[in-house]
Amino acid sequence: AINRADSGVAPTTSASLVWVLSNFGPNITVFAPTNLAFQQLLTVQITQALIAQGVPPLTAAAQAAFLASTPAVFSTPALYPVLTPTVVKGIVVYHLLGSRAFLNNFPTAATSYPTLLNSAVPTHPGVSLNCTFTGPFVSAATVKGIANPTASNILINPTPEPNGTSDQFFVNGVIHKIDQVLRPQ
């Protein structure tokens, strides 16, 4: 997805997602959807595109399910009209916050936060973050995209014991695994 989003962009410039994600300067938070979450969304998107091209619905659904399940889905030329660099980059940057957001700093009431998409669309409402504490520990957390009908669960690792976290630390930020692809529109 990153390579498709960076099509036509030099990887050594700040406009490149490769640069943002590998540079030690910016602190970021990544909401990383599971493979299943991406497959479900892509299957729907590809099915709709194939039906629009005249492919019968059952055939379109079968082809879409196959294409969405391959690791090469973002580099399949037949899908370039559906998965344009602009669309893919919009989805990827919508999953990135421009600061580190650890679970223990999440609000207990749904609160909107800007994503890196806001650098291109300043008026976009961003994502909504929320968590539930049981004593001093986070027991549940969600992130919701503006076009998602329901909030995505942040998958909390049950270890380290006795209370887990989803905070996966990296040199330039933190990653939280989520169960849906966040949809900006």
Regions found by a protein language model. Give the residues of each.
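Mature, structured domains of secreted/extracytosolic soluble proteins
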Residues: 1-185
